[in-house]
A protein has these predicted regions:
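Conserved beta-strand scaffold positions in the cores of enzyme catalytic domains, especially
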Residues: 51-53, 76, 102-104, 209-211, ...
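Glycine-/small-residue-rich active-site loops that bind phosphorylated ligands and cofactors
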Residues: 17-20, 43, 84, 110, ...
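Acidic, Mg2+-coordinating active-site environments of NTP-dependent enzymes
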Residues: 42-47, 154-302, 318
Length: 320
């Protein structure tokens, strides 16, 4: 944004349907940017070496983000899924932050622009990164995975959303599974998987799996103990682990596997159980997701997700 250029920053002239970032490059340099990457030479000022001319600014940004990610030793966790990506990402990041310096996607900036923008925020002090990746057409998760190069991954679920972009439910599964395809080829990779979800288990062959769910012998397992209105559950590690009870501020049983995912990843990266429970109990949804709000007459209103364009009712996810 040319209106927000800290001294020494880099301006990249992205284009949209109603704007051309090249037209703002001069203003960005005058506002404090050290350099401006443009892809239309007529916007450069002759003799000013602060302009960097490239073929395509967006592609350059994506390549730069991948290069930057490779220079740092940060372990990267990639997350995708039809629903629950953002809440699960927030829960995972909250838990991991109890013991790590974590970079994570802000809001749901999970597309071809948001993902590289997040990666470019990586700093040497970050030892973990949680990167959310979204898709509305085949090949998009493959493309984003090649930018992110995650070391670990999680697919929250697969459901019948954005079918117009994927063509069919099978297309959704295949596209979300592109994260698994990338990790299957990466040496030393790990996949955190909801063992109760048959769709995910069916496409997880050949992966190093860390499972969570309701079965007693899983890496992390648990059961719901209450949901009126806030989700309460028990969990333990393995068959003989110590059992814990957690009272969350989350609405909806559908958040149970999201919480188990955060516990699983937290334990995998060495967060103490007490710290995990403290983080989950203290987490309050912020993005108009699974929130209980009061009206002026003090009655409760349950907000599922005000990003209406991605809401979908998916009984098949619940039943599997």
């Amino acid at each position: 944004d040319s209106r927000n250029c800290p001294d020494g920053s880099l301006f990249i002239a992205l284009k949209g349907e109603s704007f051309n970032g090249n037209a703002f490059a001069k203003f960005a340099l005058e506002s404090g940017c050290a350099y401006a990457i443009i892809d239309e030479g007529e916007y450069a000022v002759e003799g000013d070496q602060r302009y960097i001319l490239v073929d395509n600014c967006l592609q350059t940004m994506q390549q730069l983000a991948n290069y930057h990610r490779r220079q740092l030793g940060t372990k990267v966790i990639g997350i995708t899924g039809t629903n629950g990506k953002t809440t699960t990402k927030e829960l995972i990041s909250t838990v991991l932050s109890q013991a790590h310096n974590v970079l994570y996607t802000l809001g749901n900036l999970n597309n071809h622009i948001g993902v590289p923008t997040t990666l470019l925020r990586l700093k040497p002090e970050h030892d973990l990164a949680v990167i959310e990746m979204g898709a509305n057409h085949p090949g998009e998760i493959k493309f984003l995975s090649e930018i992110v190069e995650p070391d670990c991954g999680i697919i929250t679920n697969v459901g019948k959303a954005h079918l117009e972009g994927f063509g069919s439910f099978e297309g959704v599964i295949k596209t979300k599974g592109e994260l698994y395809d990338f990790l299957r080829k990466k040496e030393g990779s790990t996949v955190f998987i909801h063992h109760d979800n048959a769709y995910l288990m069916n496409i997880a062959e050949g992966l190093n799996l860390i499972p969570y769910g309701t079965e007693d012998d899983l890496y992390v397992n648990g059961r719901i103990t209450g949901n009126s209105p806030y989700l309460t559950f028990e969990w333990k590690a393995g068959k003989d682990g110590k059992s814990y009870q957690v009272q969350t501020q989350l609405i909806g049983e559908y958040n149970f596997p999201n919480a188990l995912a955060a516990i699983t990843i937290g334990r995998f990266f060495g967060v103490e159980d007490a710290k995990i429970n403290e983080a989950l109990a203290g987490y309050t949804p912020q993005n108009n997701r699974s929130q209980l709000k009061k009206t002026d007459d003090n009655s409760n209103v349950f907000i599922c997700n005000t990003d209406l364009y991605i809401i979908s009712w998916q009984p098949q996810v619940i039943s599997h």
